[in-house]
Amino acid sequence: VLFICCNFQLVLAQPMQELPVDKNVRIGKLDNGLTYYIRHNALPEKRVEFYIAQKVGSILEEPQQRGLAHFLEHMAFNGTKNFPGDETGLGIIPWCETKGIKFGTNLNAYTSVDQTVYNISNVPTENINVVDSCLLILHDWSSAIDLADKEIDKERGVIREEWRSRNSGMLRIMTNAQSTMYPDSKYSDCMPIGSIDVINNFPYQDIRDYYAKWYRPDLQGIVIVGDINVDEIEAKLKKVFADVKAPVNPAERIYYPVADNQE
């Protein structure tokens, strides 16, 4: 374990090199600050992948919010404006599965310290309505997750079980090693799984406040790659995301430094 941690630190210590921009990627930014990246890729045929990446993770949580970045990722699948998951319409998961997009395999998300990413993969392009609906899902994740009281309470139990199953010896070693790996840094105490006390007891408004504060277009990027017409997808994306407002007096997204560790 020590060998792994030491090598992990060495990797972190390497200077970041700027990646070259693929000339085949269509890159643009909407007036609200949303950035998008679209690329045609002929293989696999008649398939496309959708991603929405947030420059948001557990590093931005306040002490009373420990675990809410990860909790919010779960809530993104539990009801949105256009996919409510109730008597008025299918939720995201059942709708996707009716189109052959399997939850956990083709429909998923992850939360890390500095980012949260959602994906819809292996989407068939033959039916343009499916492609349009996937754009609508990205829209809802960006700004229209419901966060209903009853769904939050249901998800507390799901997160508790995930917390329990992940609370292994290896995770405890990693958690305890953070203060050594990142001395005097906020990175020393911001594991995405969070605090079980917070998960059990946070007020509903706390997660709504976190969502409103950090899920905003200037911190979001859309990535669409596949066997698609780039011009058509770009036009659709601009139309779908036109109603997402730019933030007013947005909170600063601080990028916390990590000091060199000589020991």
Q: Model segments located where?
A:
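An aromatic/glycine/proline-enriched structural segment found at the starts
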Residues: 184, 221-263
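Second-shell loop/turn segments in exported
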Residues: 38, 55-62, 75-82, 117-127, ...
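Bacterial Sec-dependent N-terminal signal peptides
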Residues: 1-15
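Mature N-terminal segment immediately following signal peptide/propeptide cleavage
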Residues: 17-52
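Scaffold signal of the M16-like zinc-metallopeptidase fold and its non-catalytic homologs
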Residues: 75-80, 109-114, 130-137, 141, ...
